[in-house]
A protein has these predicted regions:
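Short loop/beta submotifs within extracellular cysteine-rich repeat domains
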Residues: 16-17, 27-28, 52-53, 60-63, ...
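Short, structured motif recognition centered on aromatic/hydrophobic residues
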Residues: 4, 18-21, 45, 52-55, ...
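Residues at alpha-helix termini
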Residues: 23-24, 70, 94
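Short Gly/Pro-enriched loop/turn and capping motifs at secondary-structure junctions
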Residues: 59-60, 85
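Hydrophobic side chains in well-ordered alpha-helices
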Residues: 17-20, 88-92
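Vicinal oxygen chelate
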Residues: 4-12, 33, 43-46, 65-138
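Long, hydrophobic N-terminal alpha-helical segment
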Residues: 1-40, 47, 62
């Protein structure tokens, strides 16, 4: 794994949370994006070389809506940047980690993403991210 790519925070209201984090960080978000396949709308803030992703549920069945219903707003996941997501999934599977989606799916911010089950990582949902090559970006 190369670096911490971002920290994902589940929020009830993206607009209100964007204003809160703008006041906290002293800078505005640089991107808002919907990930229809996951039923979420996201915004991103830069903090030094790192990012914070705020995630708002768009539908009641989305993973973010379920997370907020069970735990309330707060840190949802930590994401790590990887160079080869397929190789990293194989490595982590061989180490006994439970991969929630072995086939990478398209996530926010032009990334391929895979998630590890939190039960095997001290209760932390881990996301692996690999940049989608520009030629594949729609």
């Amino acid at each position: 794994m190369d670096k911490i790519e971002h920290i994902g925070i589940a929020v009830k209201d993206l607009e209100t949370s964007n204003l809160l984090f703008q006041r906290l960080l002293g800078t505005a978000h640089y991107k808002i994006e919907e990930v229809a396949s996951e039923g979420v709308r996201t915004s991103f803030f830069k903090v030094g070389n790192q990012k914070i992703e705020l995630l708002e549920a768009l539908v009641a069945e989305s993973p973010i809506a379920k997370f907020i219903a069970q735990r309330g707003e707060g840190i949802h996941h930590i994401a790590f940047s990887v160079k080869d997501i397929i190789a990293e999934v194989k490595r982590l599977s061989s180490e006994g980690f439970v991969v929630l989606n072995e086939k990478p799916m398209r996530g926010a911010d032009n990334k391929w993403v895979v998630f590890l089950h939190p039960k095997g990582v001290n209760g932390v949902l881990v996301e692996l991210c690999q940049d989608i090559p520009q030629a594949e970006v729609e």
